Swiss-Prot record:
This is DNA damage-inducible transcript 4 protein. Keywords: Apoptosis, Cytoplasm, Mitochondrion. The lineage of its organism: Eukaryota, Metazoa, Chordata, Craniata, Vertebrata. It holds the Pfam family RTP801_C. Gene3D superfamilies: RTP801-like (3.90.470.40). PANTHER family: DNA DAMAGE-INDUCIBLE TRANSCRIPT 4 PROTEIN (PTHR12478:SF7), DNA-DAMAGE-INDUCIBLE TRANSCRIPT 4 PROTEIN DDIT4 (PTHR12478). It is found in: Cytoplasm; Mitochondrion. One of its GO terms (biological process) is negative regulation of signal transduction.
Length: 219
């Protein structure tokens, strides 16, 4: 009997054969211009929901009017609870943005933009291991061929970011004649005016723990 056991224990099961997935180039050719523009931007302001300048300092009386729709696909209670606070912080960053290159005093953010952005953030964070808490968000405003960096937001500083979202916002196209006038004349001190953002935007998602291709979604 011992001899039989020794013979059995001497047998070994061959290890499984693992095929390594080919490394894919992260930035596709169609995104090269966006990556080059955003990579050359000056260092942006950093914000966090857990920092001292948190969303609790925001004075948004009309925020309760914005609500996120229920969806069976977005069953992340923690993310849904966190999202309104994150949108408050995003709105505060856009309101405080240093936009001297646009020669306007402030950006106007439509509620439709924030509502659509909230849905998109939940959608892109749903498959992530830490959900929305693992997001690193870069806010940018496109005008013409330029891309102006507004702020970088770390949703939760206690969590190592697992994915990066670059939100590309656009100015309202109906304001283009006014914008052309701003760029065609010399700047006048104190002549800045408000410019409204378009409800549409584009989001670029990069997984920081994977070599998967860049995900681009436009709303």
């Amino acid at each position: 009997m011992p001899a039989r056991w020794d013979t059995f224990s001497a047998l070994s099961v061959p290890p499984p054969i693992l095929e390594e997935e080919p490394q894919s180039q992260f930035w596709g050719e169609d995104c090269a211009d966006v990556s080059q523009r955003c990579s050359s931007l000056p260092s942006s302001d950093c914000e966090s929901l857990t920092s001292s300048n948190s969303y609790s300092e925001c004075d948004l009386d009309a925020w309760d009017e914005i609500s996120l729709p229920d969806s069976e696909l977005l069953n992340d209670p923690e993310g849904e609870q966190l999202c309104p606070s994150l949108l408050k912080l995003i709105k505060r960053c856009l309101t405080k943005a240093k936009i001297n290159s646009l020669r306007c005093s402030r950006l106007l953010i439509p509620d439709e933009l924030l509502c659509n952005l909230g849905q998109e953030l939940l959608h892109l964070a749903y498959s992530e291991p830490c959900g929305l808490r693992g997001a690193l968000i870069d806010l940018c405003v496109e005008h013409g061929k330029d891309c102006h960096s507004v702020a970088q937001i770390t949703v939760d500083q206690a969590v190592v970011p697992t994915f990066q979202l670059t939100v590309l916002l656009r100015l309202d196209s109906r304001l283009w004649p006014r914008i052309q006038g701003l760029f065609s004349t010399k700047p006048v001190p104190g002549s800045g005016q408000s410019l409204k953002l378009s409800p549409g935007f584009k989001v670029l998602k990069k997984k920081l723990y994977s070599s998967e291709e860049l995900i681009i979604e436009e709303c």
